[in-house]
Amino acid sequence: MSIQTPEQLIDRLANDLAWRKKELSAMKSLIEAKNVSDKRHKVLLRSGVCILYSHWEGFVKLAANSYLEYVISQKLTYQKLSSNFLALAMKEKLKKAKETHKASLYIPVCEFFISELNQRSILPKPKDVISTGSNLNSEILKEITYILGIDFSIYSTKSPLINTQLLKTRNEIAHGEDSVFDRDEYLELHRDIIGMLDIFRNQIENAAIQKKFRRDSP
């Protein structure tokens, strides 16, 4: 079912984040358990980092795609879209013109800006826009926030955590390296990632409620 109201968007985000938090909570409980061998505890920590990353990437992608789906469902004209979404709509037109190096292909682009802004907008499908490449680092997150028109500065101080503690460690584990990660490091990482997921969810919900996708939003 397509998302056509802020309430539907909020419900989708709430339901998705709920099961992710439940699974992460279960993993955290296993890692905090005292009655496990050091060998098993190491396995749990390595598994925990991988699961933590999967939910970080999974929720950001779902939330971003869901918001874009909601914006598309509003069927706004180009002139009513905020700058970030207008840029997204124009991306393919400009890309085709640039790739051919033919000046003639810029003529339709110019005509669009002159006479077609009052037409109903056509935005690309969410799956063609939001891509993490299975490596959701801080730069990719920044690009996603720019596409959606939400604030990245909240995450800027978390870049080392995202890029090194989470992504680099997860990649090392996934590639079979014997990375060392202790309980306290994991628990701190768990808290920080849960916090960022909540922030991202709130940003998406607020953007929808406040109609930040519209040029005339307050």
Q: What positions do the PLM features span?
A:
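Helix-loop junctions and short alpha-helical segments
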Residues: 51-52, 59, 64-155
